[in-house]
A protein has these predicted regions:
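Internal glycine-rich alpha/beta core junctions
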Residues: 1-121
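Glycine-rich cofactor/substrate-binding loops
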Residues: 90-265
Length: 265
């Protein structure tokens, strides 16, 4: 909405055509009240700050995830040397500094958002000089946050992915138990609740066997105990827990199948 004509917050005695100036300047129309846009001079900055803070939250989540996956314990990705720095004393260190800075900038964005909200919480009706500082804060926020987008883009572009390690991790810790349960429901008729209880039992039995995925023997035992007359083979049980098979079957919109990921990109 067009604030032109509000003056210092109480309008003017000049006979202005506020609708005309709104049309000429490309606004949808003038503000209905002249006091509101002057009192609320902090609102546009705060709305932008909120959007930037949420964007930074997403980037920080990505940064945190990449840092974790790049550790020796996970070893799923390796950051490019461009995005790492050494230690002040430890020769072997590869500190993920670019990602850590993104996390720090996210905290800064949160602080700026809170500052803007506080600036608007105790104003008098009309003009307040307090809101002059909201202009400086929002410019600082944008300047500090803007580089994070290009940095994260480059991190992803240069990231080395350890597919072998990822596949190994995906095949462990019962990652295919859910897809196995869903397959059982489709083979039924078998209620989802019942199938879940069967697979839960099978997981416990498989854990006792020292397995990282549901074994054919444990699932057969669970089916027998739960009196579920479902015909399965060892091949079925193994096939439905393979990561490649799971991704191939996860084909609805927005899912992580290869086809859908390419569509999103």
């Amino acid at each position: 909405k067009n604030p032109l004509g509000a003056a210092a917050g109480y309008g003017t005695t000049f006979n202005l055509d506020r609708q005309l100036t709104s049309t000429l300047l490309g606004f949808d129309g003038p503000t209905e009240n002249v006091t509101d846009p002057i009192t609320q001079r902090w609102e546009p900055e705060t709305e932008l700050a909120y959007d930037v803070a949420v964007m930074m939250d997403h980037l920080s989540t990505m940064a945190q995830t990449f840092i974790l996956l790049s550790t020796r314990e996970f070893n799923m990705v390796r950051l490019n040397d461009r995005h790492c720095t050494g230690s002040s004393i430890m020769p072997q260190k590869r500190n993920p500094c670019s990602l850590e800075v993104i996390k720090a900038k996210t905290s800064f964005a949160h602080g700026m958002l809170v500052s803007l909200l506080f600036a608007g919480k105790s104003l008098f009706m009309g003009y307040n000089r307090d809101t002059q500082w909201t202009k400086y804060w929002i410019m600082d926020l944008v300047d500090e946050s803007k580089p994070a987008l290009s940095v994260m883009t480059e991190v992803i572009r240069l990231l080395q992915v350890n597919k072998t390690q990822m596949l190994k991790q995906a095949e462990e810790e019962f990652g295919g138990a859910t897809s196995l349960m869903e397959w059982m429901v489709r083979q039924g008729p078998l209620p989802l609740r019942k199938a879940k209880m069967v697979v839960e039992k099978a997981v416990k039995y498989s854990e006792k066997e020292g397995k990282g995925k549901v074994s054919y023997q444990s699932l057969k035992k669970a089916l027998t105990e739960m009196k579920v007359p479902l015909s399965i083979t060892k091949k079925n049980v193994e096939e439905m827990q393979r990561p490649e098979k799971i991704l191939a079957q996860t084909s609805s919109m927005g899912t992580p199948s290869e086809k859908r990921i390419k569509e999103n990109i």
